Amino acid sequence: MSILSTLDPEVADAIRLEADRQEYNLELIASENFVSTAVLEAQGSVLTNKYAEGYPGKRYYGGCHNVDIVEALAIERAKQLFDAEHANVQPHSGSQANMAVYFSALKPGDTILGMNLSHGGHLTHGSPVNFSGRFFNVVPYGVSPETQTIDYAEVERLALEHKPKMIVVGASAYPRTIDFAAFRAIADKVGALVMVDMAHIAGLVAAGLHPSPIPHAEFVTTTTHKTLRGPRGGMILCQERFAKSINSQIFPGIQGGPLMHVIAAKAVAFKEALQPEFKQYQQQVVNNARTLAEELVKRGFKLTSGGTDNHLMLLDFSGTEITGKAAEEALDKAGITANKNTVPFETRSPFVTSGIRIGTPAATTHGLKEAEMVLVAGFIADAVANIGSDETLAAIKLQVNQLMKKFPLYAKG
């Protein structure tokens, strides 16, 4: 950091403070993780200087032979990791991956079925404030009031009634296993395409700990961070017959030059995910989530659907005076980073909410295991019980910091 500190001390100080936050705070945001030093090195490489519009072997710029090697590696590793016929590793984000699929397979005004955002879906699955809700006729499906799990009977009823061109599967706050085969069967009854957004569970899928959507969907999109533990970015996997249309929608359709330094980091992350250690890591993520959920229930917390099958859980404060916003702020003062989240059948504003979303991927990367999850549940319970007591929250933060010092993230140079 010496060169940066000299040239731009303001930015250098902000980076240093963020590094300390990641080291000593407890990161429980379900969509966040920590990349390896190898991924950091690739993303901070000289590849950031290279424009490479087009695809390997078919570029619009010269001097692309080295970045062609990198992108080809990323593509082949992605295909191997998920047993996919085709991979496009150029999307800058999961949202742009979803946009490319929509624009390649749909026309404006076409009907899509997507999971209700307040029930655990995602903005790009048809929210009216998002492009997906403006370009297409969206019919939302959700969870059962009784079980708070996806109501497949409702999905089938809506599909038969509205005859969607595409059914969008996937979520950003759904703690249970998704039955991709059931969605495929429903789609086949109405001749619909299936797009699965597996952004949150991609790492679990790669490790064989969640059923793969690949056999059941024409299109699968994902981010490359979250459980996959790569750089922030997106990717599309699809059947070979859609490869040309997907590629042309990414470039020149919605993007220009790909971010080759990020694609290099994706390639490195995919190689890491192909190692046996990655499956062990993902198993620990699931074990930690299960333990944390059980411990929170013991302490009187209500969890959406009663628990978790994957890496995340949703604390539900509906019916109480506690809001997600207040709980998030209290946890932050206690050195615990989480995010407020709507719960199914939400009655509060999305800026206030009745829930908190918690995930274990980042904490597991730090090295925390089941024993630490018991402590974490205690920290969360104490923080939520002491909303408004800054002195108590500061004391909890000291305990959190002491715990995290035992599990260093990056070796200090």
Swiss-Prot record:
Enzyme class: transferase
Needed cofactors: pyridoxal 5'-phosphate
Species lineage: Bacteria, Pseudomonadati, Thermodesulfobacteriota, Desulfuromonadia, Desulfuromonadales
Species: Pelobacter propionicus (strain DSM 2379 / NBRC 103807 / OttBd1)
Pfam families: SHMT
UniProt keyword list: Amino-acid biosynthesis, Cytoplasm, One-carbon metabolism, Pyridoxal phosphate, Transferase
Name of the protein in question: Serine hydroxymethyltransferase
Enzyme Commission number: 2.1.2.1
Amino acids binding (6S)-5,6,7,8-tetrahydrofolate: 117, 121-123, 349-351
Subcellular location as annotated: Cytoplasm
Residue numbers bearing the N6-(pyridoxal phosphate)lysine modification: 226
GO biological process: glycine biosynthetic process from serine; tetrahydrofolate interconversion
A GO CC term assigned to this protein in UniProt: cytosol
InterPro entries to which the protein is assigned, alphabetical: PyrdxlP-dep_Trfase, PyrdxlP-dep_Trfase_major, PyrdxlP-dep_Trfase_small, Ser_HO-MeTrfase, Ser_HO-MeTrfase-like, Ser_HO-MeTrfase_PLP_BS, SHMT-like_dom
Pathway: One-carbon metabolism; tetrahydrofolate interconversion; Amino-acid biosynthesis; glycine biosynthesis; glycine from L-serine: step 1/1
Catalyzed reaction equations: (6R)-5,10-methylene-5,6,7,8-tetrahydrofolate + glycine + H2O = (6S)-5,6,7,8-tetrahydrofolate + L-serine
GO MF annotation, one: glycine hydroxymethyltransferase activity
Complex and partners: Homodimer.
